[in-house]
């Protein structure tokens, strides 16, 4: 049973006695904010769900206030993930298995790349303006981010080569690339997906093979309806932002990042810089589609797969030339069409 607004108010009133003296806001401020947030995000809870979600919302409301009050150029807000604990968020939305590959060549060579010279001059490119990027998609509660990063880069290089931008099938990758090391909604790697597409001689379009937010037992690839092909792929030198930026001048690039922090979960605007980010423990696949500079702050334009209501209409500006913050150049790659 979903709760009515009246019953919600009753439950909130009953929870007053549990409010800690350490809370940042008054009971009424928490209450009003949560009700407004529920309405704007079309959220509805059962009786059992309500109080845990409300408690997590209050914690996130405090976190956002404390972060923003420090004057960071990264702005946080109460987005669609504001009723989730950080653990719940990581479990449901992150899924790049980068640690598998970092145990090999990339991790051993990471330290050799971080101190290479970086671009000093401002660089500006945005592949959205060149019709090489499809609209923001939504992976839902499935750790399929790697498949969206993969289709994004294949869509980009194909559009640049042919002049035609076609939305490609993430479901095709989810259902059919397990033999290449991917694990469906439990994560995978973009390079594994590239290997699958090469071996498979192509990928279906989103229209031909729609996304279902789950893995099917059967691969339903339509051999006679290939929408895009690639011949190979190139991996960026691990940790080398120079190499990543050179690649971005050519086409969009698939990147793996550390997105595990509350600051990423609740990102709303500004240039994202997280001092606690790891450059090796990577857990989310996204798509770098350009780069720019804002008031002296260099950034990458990064397309996420959490729908257009997250971040900057589905995008995030991530710090550029900041010692590979969040590992954005640790495991970057792009296909060759």
Swiss-Prot record:
Q: Which UniProt keywords apply?
A: Disulfide bond, Hydrolase, Lysosome, Protease, Signal, Thiol protease, Zymogen
- Subcellular location, in the record's words? Lysosome
Look up the signal peptide feature and give its range: 1-21
Q: Which catalytic residues are annotated?
A: 145, 284, 304
Q: Which GO CC terms are listed, alphabetically?
A: extracellular space; lysosome
Propeptide positions in the record are 22-120
Which InterPro entries does the protein's record reference?
Papain-like_cys_pep_sf (IPR038765), Pept_cys_AS (IPR000169), Pept_his_AS (IPR025660), Peptidase_C1A (IPR013128), Peptidase_C1A_C (IPR000668), Peptidase_C1A_papain-like (IPR039417), Prot_inhib_I29 (IPR013201)
- State which residue ranges cross the membrane: none
SUPFAM superfamilies documented for this protein: Cysteine proteinases
Q: What is this protein called?
A: Cysteine proteinase 3
Native species of this protein?
A: Dictyostelium discoideum
Query: Could you tell me the gene encoding this protein?
Result: cprC
